[in-house]
């Protein structure tokens, strides 16, 4: 989150209050994951302070907590250097399931290490968008897009390819 900690806690509590009557889970972000989801701006990253993560968890009761450990939304301009020391400390100090935003471009080895160290959910949206675009372009260039359903099929195939690739990387195939 780009909000100061106190504001982030207050906003998250407000959202949780709205979500709970509907049985909806709430995921919140603490620390500042760099980049931006649509790649339109470069936002500086600030790693999550483990003490702040403990306070955030205690004061909000959030269902899942996305932390900043050197990860960034969108495509990386350089190879990310993840702070596994911070991840390990947050995982040790909290009980809330941990989330990694900005998974696109992280190496398979680092994905596995994240999972082994406490991350339970990894977001890979940008990789999915890129795979969909690449698949649609390939189908279009091959003359295989004759209408809406062809386009939709190519989009689904692109998303499937990326999801399948990451399922294999994460080692979660056959573990539904």
Regions found by a protein language model. Name each.
Residues 1-94, 108-124, 130, 134-138, ...:
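Alpha/beta enzyme core
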Residues 137-176:
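Extended, intrinsically disordered, low-complexity segments
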């Amino acid at each position: 989150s780009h909000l100061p900690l106190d504001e982030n806690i207050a906003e998250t509590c407000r959202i949780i209050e709205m979500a709970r009557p509907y049985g909806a889970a709430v995921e919140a972000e603490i620390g500042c994951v760099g980049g931006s989801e649509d790649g339109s701006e470069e936002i500086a990253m600030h790693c999550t302070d483990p003490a702040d993560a403990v306070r955030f968890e205690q004061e909000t009761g959030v269902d899942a907590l996305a932390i900043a450990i050197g990860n960034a939304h969108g495509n990386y301009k350089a190879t990310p250097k993840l702070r596994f020391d911070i991840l390990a400390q947050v995982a040790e100090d909290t009980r809330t399931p941990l989330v990694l935003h900005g998974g696109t471009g992280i190496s398979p080895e680092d994905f596995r290490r994240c999972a082994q160290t406490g991350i339970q959910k990894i977001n890979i949206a940008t990789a999915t968008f890129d795979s969909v675009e690449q698949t649609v372009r390939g189908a279009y260039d091959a003359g295989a897009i004759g209408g809406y359903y062809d386009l939709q099929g190519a989009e689904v195939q692109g998303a499937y390819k990326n999801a399948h690739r990451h399922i294999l990387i994460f080692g979660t195939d056959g573990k539904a």
